[in-house]
Amino acid sequence: MYALSEKGERIRAMFGSIAPRYDLLNRLLSLGIDRRWRRFAVKKIGLNGSGRVLDVATGTGDVALEIASQTPASVSIVGIDFTPEMIELGRVKVKDSRHCGRITLQVAPCEEIPFDDGSFDAATISFGIRNVVDRIKGLAEMHRVLKNDGKIVILEFSTPTLPVFKDLYHFYFLKVLPKIGGAFSRFSAYQYLPDSVLEFPSREVFKGMMTQVGFKDVRHFDLTGGIATVYVGTK
């Protein structure tokens, strides 16, 4: 069993504490834009026939459900997350959906995915890779469980490139967002969010990390002026 670092345990406990309000807060804080980002990311999977998709850091299952809505009924989805509270909420959401027979959720960390080599046709992780303490290990694990020619799609917050937009973004993330989040949940959790985004590697550095673990044809797509970025690669 993979043992999380002290930092990893703190992150897991933090997400556990905000789990009941996680979806509502994301809608409020992003003004609903995150839904469009997820739809765009899932389209990049490009799985039109039967297959199996792994959604890492699935949270309460939003991306797993989006994958189910965009793919044929012959596609099955497995969602994993290291936060039990998120998985519990996700299971309720999946059970109440029309896709309940296609999605299974379980507790597991990105750094030790409990599946055999070459088990999946595609893998996704949305707003989760920045919370993985050992990102190289997490990327390597996702690479391991993919079949040859399998695709990885990563959606993550990023820093805008336009100077004026970048300044406004930093002001919102550092000053406004933590206060809004703190009104609904633990202030420290929504102070962590902007800090984790701002310390995330640049697009080119992160693509280099993907290449380092074996992904090829790595590219990225900026969304909403670069507030979010989708990274795509192939095993």
From Swiss-Prot:
Coiled-coil stretches: none
Classification lineage: Bacteria, Pseudomonadati, Thermodesulfobacteriota, Desulfuromonadia, Geobacterales
Name of the featured protein: Ubiquinone/menaquinone biosynthesis C-methyltransferase UbiE
Family matches, as InterPro entries: SAM-dependent_MTases_sf, UbiE/COQ5_MeTrFase, UbiE/COQ5_MeTrFase_CS
Organism (species): Citrifermentans bemidjiense (strain ATCC BAA-1014 / DSM 16622 / JCM 12645 / Bem) (Geobacter bemidjiensis)
Any one of the GO BP annotations: menaquinone biosynthetic process
Reactions catalysed: a 2-demethylmenaquinol + S-adenosyl-L-methionine = a menaquinol + S-adenosyl-L-homocysteine + H(+); a 2-methoxy-6-(all-trans-polyprenyl)benzene-1,4-diol + S-adenosyl-L-methionine = a 5-methoxy-2-methyl-3-(all-trans-polyprenyl)benzene-1,4-diol + S-adenosyl-L-homocysteine + H(+)
Protein EC: 2.1.1.163, 2.1.1.201
Family under the similarity heading: Belongs to the class I-like SAM-binding methyltransferase superfamily. MenG/UbiE family.
